[in-house]
Amino acid sequence: MPIRVPDELPAVNFLREENVFVMTTSRASGQEIRPLKVLILNLMPKKIETENQFLRLLSNSPLQVDIQLLRIDSRESRNTPAEHLNNFYCNFEDIQEQNFDGLIVTGAPLGLVEFNDVAYWPQIKQVLEWSKDHVTSTLFVCWAVQAALNILYGIPKQTRTDKLSGVYEHHILHPHALLTRGFDDSFLAPHSRYADFPAALIRDYTDLEILAETEEGDAYLFASKDKRIAFVTGHPEYDAQTLAQEYFRDVEAGLDPDVPYNYFPHNDPQNTPRASWRSHGNLLFTNWLNYYVYQITPYDLRHMNPTLD
């Protein structure tokens, strides 16, 4: 699926070097097919890096995907040039009257911060409330899962004593579920979080269906039966080097982090890590776009009036 992005977005050249099909807006305008409109609320500090990761995964299906990047934090960024944010990101006020086929809410390094202490917590709640009437399907990733469970289901913040970091094995619970269609019975995916997601908590306090979990009984992938909301507690979008960058950053900060589990060959940080989750990440996002977005979204978004009820 060619993703449609602004002509000058840095990800265009970055992904073309990997032979990822990226279609600029100027080229796409000549095609008579409605692209899927996907809004990405990017909460990660290194926004360009995160854009590259998610756009790579959104590029693997047969239809156009029209990407709109959203920011809700008006503070000056220390990791992303202001010019980039001004050129490629919109504010909520710019899109609040629009409808979208899909919304992705990324993770954020806020695992040890109380919800009410998050600078943009009111804006997060506003976007989630807005999405009920303006988005066909929303995918929450890592910290965004924890935030959404609190806002939508009233589940208090669950925090691990130690950070979960590494590449972990998961198994699917419903082989014929659409979101896990084509998954291996067991698969690997990276995690980098303090948030805790016990499967029992999800089963006891929500109506969500758990589709995949870790060997330790943590929920990894779960969704509503109407496909309107889906949750992934790990980081299937991560590059091969992302966990290494986080590890060495924490080492330099004197935090004495554990070596990411099952990541560096022979558990030696001097060895170059290899991504063992790429096929899983691509299939997950392809399934979400196809079965949770494309198959149920209306052709004319002006007529969309979805509800979570």
UniProtKB/Swiss-Prot annotation:
Residues given in the record as substrate binding sites: K163, S192, R249
Site note Important for acyl-CoA specificity, residues: G111
Catalytic activity: L-homoserine + succinyl-CoA = O-succinyl-L-homoserine + CoA
UniProt KW Ion transport keyword: no
GO cellular component, one term: cytoplasm
Presence of keyword Cell membrane: no
Mechanisms controlling activity: Allosterically inhibited by SAM and methionine.
Top-level class of the enzyme under EC nomenclature: transferase
GO MF term set: homoserine O-acetyltransferase activity; homoserine O-succinyltransferase activity
Pathway note: Amino-acid biosynthesis; L-methionine biosynthesis via de novo pathway; O-succinyl-L-homoserine from L-homoserine: step 1/1
Active site: C142, H235, E237
CDD domains in the cross-refs: GATase1_HTS
Feature type site, description Important for substrate specificity: S192
Subcellular location as annotated: Cytoplasm
Primary location recorded for the protein, binned into one broad class: cytoplasm
Recorded coiled-coil stretches: none
Family: Belongs to the MetA family.
Quaternary state and interactors: Homodimer.
Protein name according to UniProt: Homoserine O-succinyltransferase
Gene, per the UniProt record: metAS
